[in-house]
Amino acid sequence: MYDEERIVSGDSFEGEDLNEQSLRPQTFDQYIGQKLLKDEISVYIQAAKQREESLDHVLLYGPPGLGKTTLAIVIANEMGVKIKTTTGPAIEKPGDLVALLNELEPGDVLFIDEIHRLPKNVEEILYSAMEDYFIDIIVGQGPTAHPVHFPLPPFTLVGATTRAGLLSAPLRARFGIVGHMEYYNEVDLSQIIKRSAQILSTGIDDEGAHEIARRSRGTPRVANRLLKRVRDFAEVKHKDKIDTEIVQFALDLLRVDKVGLDRTDRKLLKAMIELYDGGPVGLNTIAANIGEESDTIADMIEPYLMQIGFIKRTPRGRMVTLAAYEHLGIKYNKEG
């Protein structure tokens, strides 16, 4: 069974978003990483402000924990407008969407996380709202049913998804700005960790920050989570600052290895090696053998393993690479 609170998961834990708020950057000057995307959106914001228009609709996609919500907040702040946040599953019926849109003022940002999970009837109403700033909904039932026209102020929809492929073509086509959120490099993650440590009034040296960064799976949310856990160990050990020694001690105890793999990652790789000679093997077969949902593997486990070159996809299925064998200390017997 998948552990919803894997410490290296990019997903947020229950209540974690509230704790993260103090660490979130509020402006582009504070926002570290994603330089190309940040520079691109910054230009669009400056142009929209010069024309005194709302920013075009923005779609952000990529693995969880990379800062899609934070970037939406920064966009609103840079535009000088308010932001209203919700999720796709929370908008259950057209009336829920109407209520959200009616609260917006001209230029405001509506952020919908997990936008790929919007119900179809809600998504269809969103088309005219995004394109022409109005919605038509049917009020009443039977013979008394009639359409009601709701004009809307110009607004910016920022949609976020971890599964861009699940978005319908009509919805995807209505986003003028599409940004791919990429995994962070260790230099940027180290800067994020040092900034967070400063906000948390926690001392940390460069080597300690780098050691956390290399185990953070390219993900700021994971980096901040590991920082907080290491801080606990440092305080209990009466360390005046976080250094490499305390990071290694804490994260080894938490079973997060030097490249950020945890027990679930290692279980997956070892099952593929021991049961299927490293592959190729189908996703559903892997899922059945390790007791996980195939969607969980595809969304939460596999992307990082592919990013670091430990798994590769082939037409016949997934395969474990030589690099993964070497990392796990398992002899590689395949030829070719």
Swiss-Prot record:
Protein name in the entry: Holliday junction branch migration complex subunit RuvB
Native source species: Ligilactobacillus salivarius (strain UCC118) (Lactobacillus salivarius)
Compartments (UniProt record): Cytoplasm
Chain residue ranges for the region called Large ATPase domain (RuvB-L): 1-184
Domain comment quoted from the record: Has 3 domains, the large (RuvB-L) and small ATPase (RuvB-S) domains and the C-terminal head (RuvB-H) domain. The head domain binds DNA, while the ATPase domains jointly bind ATP, ADP or are empty depending on the state of the subunit in the translocation cycle. During a single DNA translocation step the structure of each domain remains the same, but their relative positions change.
Function: The RuvA-RuvB-RuvC complex processes Holliday junction (HJ) DNA during genetic recombination and DNA repair, while the RuvA-RuvB complex plays an important role in the rescue of blocked DNA replication forks via replication fork reversal (RFR). RuvA specifically binds to HJ cruciform DNA, conferring on it an open structure. The RuvB hexamer acts as an ATP-dependent pump, pulling dsDNA into and through the RuvAB complex. RuvB forms 2 homohexamers on either side of HJ DNA bound by 1 or 2 RuvA tetramers; 4 subunits per hexamer contact DNA at a time.
Reactions performed catalytically: ATP + H2O = ADP + phosphate + H(+)
Quaternary data: Homohexamer. Forms an RuvA(8)-RuvB(12)-Holliday junction (HJ) complex. HJ DNA is sandwiched between 2 RuvA tetramers; dsDNA enters through RuvA and exits via RuvB. An RuvB hexamer assembles on each DNA strand where it exits the tetramer. Each RuvB hexamer is contacted by two RuvA subunits (via domain III) on 2 adjacent RuvB subunits; this complex drives branch migration. In the full resolvosome a probable DNA-RuvA(4)-RuvB(12)-RuvC(2) complex forms which resolves the HJ.
This protein's record includes keyword Zinc: no
GO biological process, alphabetically ordered: DNA recombination; DNA repair
Top EC class, one word: hydrolase
Chief location of this protein within or outside the cell: cytoplasm
Keywords: ATP-binding, Cytoplasm, DNA damage, DNA recombination, DNA repair, DNA-binding, Hydrolase, Nucleotide-binding
Keyword Protease recorded: no
Binding site for DNA: 313, 318
Signal peptide: none
Similarity annotation: Belongs to the RuvB family.
Source organism superkingdom: Bacteria
EC number: 3.6.4.-
Gene Ontology cellular-component annotations: cytoplasm; Holliday junction resolvase complex
InterPro entries linked: AAA+_ATPase, AAA_lid_4, DNA_helicase_Holl-junc_RuvB, P-loop_NTPase, RuvB-like_N, RuvB_C, WH-like_DNA-bd_sf, WH_DNA-bd_sf
